[in-house]
Regions:
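Acidic/His/Gly-enriched intrinsically disordered linker/tail segments
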Residues: 1-53, 57, 63-98
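Beta/coil-rich, acidic/histidine-enriched accessory regions frequently appended to metallopeptidases
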Residues: 68-174
Length: 174
């Protein structure tokens, strides 16, 4: 279904508008894993990013290159010769672009949907905040966190910490 949504989007660039409910649902589930069933019907965005990065023909190449037992991530990493670290960096870049929809093919149509991500943070003391457990990012999922931009010249310090092994940290296949 992600493939079908991606192909529909190629034919109808205004897909984000006329089937806006898919974008609304995607925004509710950006924390889910890239291939999670929740995003099946409304997340062609990674395919768009890959095609933007590697050319319009890339999606077809990806589909034709898939081997038995591979998912799109496995195929992508294999045909682009990426390490896991390189893939993680690329998925981070993709997620950043999804905040503003900063991709040439869609930016004119999608700009009105920029900066609409929301994430609830709970104060946990000592100026630390935690994403709610139900919105903790899964593999290649992300949270868009709005920041209040301080005055120019203001020094800010941020510390990010994933606390593996605690009750609030979910692990799979470790």
């Amino acid at each position: 279904e992600m493939s079908a949504q991606y192909m529909l989007w190629q034919v109808y660039p205004e897909w984000m508008t006329f089937e806006n409910y898919h974008l609304i649902d995607f925004m509710k589930g950006t924390h889910y894993a890239f291939l999670h069933a929740y995003n099946t019907y409304h997340s062609p965005y990674v395919f768009e990013y890959w095609s933007n990065k590697r050319g319009i023909d890339f999606f077809g190449d990806l589909c034709r290159s898939t081997k038995l037992g591979e998912d799109p991530v496995m195929t992508y990493k294999r045909i682009t010769s990426q390490t896991q670290e390189q893939f993680n960096d690329e998925m981070f870049d993709a997620s950043c672009k999804f905040i503003t929809w900063d991709m040439p093919r869609i930016e004119q149509i999608a700009h009105k949907y920029a900066n609409q991500h929301t994430t609830t943070l709970n104060a946990v003391g000592d100026d630390w905040y935690r994403i709610t457990k139900d919105k903790s990012p899964q593999n290649y999922g992300y949270n868009g966190i709005k920041l209040k931009v301080p005055k120019a010249g203001t020094k800010i310090i941020l510390h990010f910490k994933g606390i593996a092994g605690t009750d609030s940290f979910s692990t799979t296949n470790l």
